[in-house]
């Protein structure tokens, strides 16, 4: 056992990849076999991650020597790399297929989500601009929230709330999309492109459209992918400045 502990502590980052991989494997198994894909595997993995964050001390589970590599894997370097990697999978020329409506939906979706989240933060009792901006960004997606919070120097508690906010949005989108699809006439690729731009949470949009019509998934995912990148640009800069002026 001591030999195993020494090997893991020496190769902390490798073990962190293995540990997160096992969580993802378990999460997607639960999503597929127990929840009938009604909740995305990514959302379940985030819930597990947030739960594990309460273990340890200030730095969460990474304070436990056995899981020290999580601190590196969960740091800003790998986080930003993941975001860039996601954006690289989308061809910028393809967004033109959505026309002006697709572009407008991105800006409208991010703006509505951000200021709705900011209002929720104020109702929750937060008064400082950094916290309000971070939680507002979390209402865009659970990636935009921590990116914005880190950029502005928000507390770990506020960043966790922003992630939780985005997670609720993802689960809600997954469940409600197939229910309201016919009512909002979400029936063709053009509709899916606008829908992805308005909602933005990629995993929620993909899961929701998959339950509605699998042929619509690539189109919704297209604009939803750009949503995260655009949110990471707007929230800690322009939207933050807007809130400071209000």
State where each predicted segment sits.
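Structural signature of hydrophobic alpha-helical transmembrane segments
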Residues: 7-20, 66-82, 108, 128-137, ...
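Entry/N-cap segments of selected transmembrane alpha helices
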Residues: 9, 13-20, 73, 92-118, ...
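Hydrophobic core segments of alpha-helical transmembrane domains in multi-pass membrane transport
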Residues: 16-29, 45-56, 82-85, 117, ...
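Hydrophobic transmembrane alpha-helices of secondary-active transporters
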Residues: 49-54, 67-97, 143
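Transmembrane alpha-helices that form the ion-translocation and gating core
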Residues: 104-145, 172-187
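Alpha-helical membrane segments and immediately flanking helix-loop junctions
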Residues: 129-172, 189-226
């Amino acid at each position: 056992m001591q030999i195993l502990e020494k090997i893991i502590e020496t190769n902390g980052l490798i073990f962190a990849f293995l540990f997160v991989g096992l969580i993802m494997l378990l999460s997607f198994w639960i999503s597929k076999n127990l929840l009938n894909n009604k909740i995305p595997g990514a959302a379940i993995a985030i819930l597990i991650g947030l739960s594990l964050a309460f273990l340890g001390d200030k730095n969460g589970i990474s304070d436990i020597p056995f899981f020290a590599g999580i601190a590196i894997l969960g740091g800003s370097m790998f986080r930003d790399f993941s975001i860039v990697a996601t954006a690289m999978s989308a061809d910028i020329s393809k967004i033109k297929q959505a026309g002006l409506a697709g572009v407008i939906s991105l800006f409208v979706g991010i703006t509505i989500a951000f200021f709705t989240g900011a209002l929720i933060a104020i109702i929750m009792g937060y008064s400082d601009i950094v916290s309000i901006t971070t939680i507002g960004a979390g209402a865009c997606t659970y990636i935009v929230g921590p990116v914005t919070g880190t950029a502005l120097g928000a507390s770990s508690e506020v960043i966790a709330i922003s992630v939780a906010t985005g997670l609720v949005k993802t689960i809600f989108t997954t469940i409600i999309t197939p229910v309201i699809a016919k009512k909002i006439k979400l029936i063709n690729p053009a509709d899916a492109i606008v829908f992805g731009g308005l909602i933005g949470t990629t995993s929620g949009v993909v899961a929701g459209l998959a339950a509605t019509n699998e042929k619509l998934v690539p189109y919704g995912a297209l604009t939803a992918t750009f949503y995260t990148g655009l949110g990471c640009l707007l929230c800690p800069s322009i939207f933050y400045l807007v809130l400071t002026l209000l």
